[in-house]
Amino acid sequence: MNTNKIALIYNKNSKHLAIIEEIKKLFNYCKIEDAEVIIIIGGDGELLHNIHRYMHLNIPFYGLNLGSLGFLMNPLDTKKLLQNIYESTVSVLNPLLMQAEDTNGQIYKALAINEVSIFRKTNQAAKFRIDINGVERMSELVADGALVATPAGSSAYNLSAGGPILPLASNMLCLTPICSFRPRRWHGALLLSSATIKFEILNITKRPVNATADFQEFNNITRVTVKSTKDQHIKLLFNKNHTLEDRIIKEQFGE
């Protein structure tokens, strides 16, 4: 991507301000609204927060890793920064759309790039029913919770919960239980990205749950519907020798 219209986003309280100042000297950056590329400096958390904030602009994001986690980021190389951006490859992500209803009947909608999760709010395990495309597939799951992950998010919370890593182009979603108690040996399911997943919370008074879409959390939820969005696209830029697809493969071999 050959462009001189580059915006720069970073945490003003970052402990890496000296490095950031060096990066700022490499080019004349512009306003975010005028940019053709947005560089986000930090870690995966900083990237996700700013993607949520600016995804409506349909501008590609280039993450530059100065954080502790950087799976969706590019390594810092100030000498080749502009060259890496110009020669970068594009990964297109479709976020998940979560619709959740709480005990007061309030409806919440939120997008998730990595995963939507539901989790017990107290020491009591959660109980819920799972429907896929309008068909009941599990009458009762007893667990700490469950999550639905995108391919890009499958190597994050989903992997820690015992779910599989998905290739980026798989057009699949992971449905993964979190510390499942009943059925004890159920490890989840792989679903087409066109699937609609619905969780109906059981015994909500005694066993309340929260729902999250990435970092957005909603309390005392009675039902959650999750599906992949087709009208919302996020473009992430990666160095040509450090693509997201390659990282997903490496993660499966513990590299």
Swiss-Prot record:
Pfam families: NAD_kinase, NAD_kinase_C
EC number: 2.7.1.23
UniProt KW keywords: ATP-binding, Cytoplasm, Kinase, NAD, NADP, Nucleotide-binding, Transferase
InterPro entries, sorted: ATP-NAD_kinase_N, ATP-NAD_kinase_PpnK-typ_C, NAD/diacylglycerol_kinase_sf, NADK
Catalytic activity: NAD(+) + ATP = ADP + NADP(+) + H(+)
GO MF term list: ATP binding; metal ion binding; NAD binding; NAD+ kinase activity
Cofactor: a divalent metal cation
Compartments, record wording: Cytoplasm
Enzyme class: transferase
Any one biological process term the GO annotation gives: NADP biosynthetic process
GO cellular component: cytoplasm
Active site: residue positions: 44
Domain of life: Bacteria
Entry binding sites for NAD(+): 44-45, 49, 114-115, 144, 152, 155-160, 216
NCBIfam families assigned to the protein according to its UniProt record, in alphabetical order: PRK04761.1 (NF003406)
Family according to the record: Belongs to the NAD kinase family.
UniProt function note: Involved in the regulation of the intracellular balance of NAD and NADP, and is a key enzyme in the biosynthesis of NADP. Catalyzes specifically the phosphorylation on 2'-hydroxyl of the adenosine moiety of NAD to yield NADP.
The protein's name in its UniProt record: NAD kinase
Organism: Rickettsia typhi (strain ATCC VR-144 / Wilmington)
The gene coding this protein: nadK
